[in-house]
Swiss-Prot record:
GO terms for cellular component: extracellular region. The modification 4-hydroxyproline is found at P14. The lineage of its organism: Eukaryota, Metazoa, Spiralia, Lophotrochozoa, Mollusca. Its main location: secreted. This is Conotoxin mr3a.
């Protein structure tokens, strides 16, 4: 999943919003 990934946690992609 994307949530919890480096990109998501550091705001590189809007997958956790």
């Amino acid at each position: 999943g994307c949530c919890g990934s480096f990109a998501c946690r550091f705001g590189c992609v809007p997958c956790c919003v």
